[in-house]
Amino acid sequence: MNYLEFHRQWRPLGCFNVQQIYSWCPDFNRHNLRVWEQKGYITKLRKEYYAFSECKTIPDFNRYIANRIYRPSYISLHTALSYYGMIPEAVVQITSVTSLKTSSFKNDFGEYSYNSVKPGLMFGYEPKTMTDGRAILFATPEKALLDLLYLNPFYKTENDMADLRLDEDFMCEDFNGEIFKEYGERTGSKALNSRIKTLLTAYGL
């Protein structure tokens, strides 16, 4: 198999793994991947996962990869909060939530961290459409903030919540406090729900 044939097959997907390749072509010569990587045609994302190097120029493709290389997962926490304009900081690392074990990866597309939660907490996310039509799973604003509190129990007092520096205009105009509380109730955690109330009080909601 030559590279042009391979490219024609997998370019619409953008990134792919070795298992997918063998499902398509059982006699595929895996050595080709090493050769194409050395030539700069493809980039290794993590063990057995690759993307076409040309995809680096596609807006938001680095976020799309986050959903693909560690599944199930969705983008949440600081990356999602920054995406919605809820926090002032620019976020370099792409942060996600997963029901798998906590993990992280670094490749030419970026740095990726995955924080583990219970399978029952894998809710509150929705697809966001990229410029080229691909979908990226993002936590809703309310779930991104809930995930942050769940994974960082040291946020306890009103002062702690104020230290998050959440955008007050967003919190007053766009953040849905009722959904936030409903999400909290779904966790079944009294301690977390208490901290949710503290955060809402801190931001006058």
Where on the chain are the PLM-derived regions?
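Nucleic-acid-binding surface
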Residues: 20, 53-205
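Short beta-edge/loop segments at beta->alpha junctions of small alpha/beta modules
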Residues: 1-72, 108
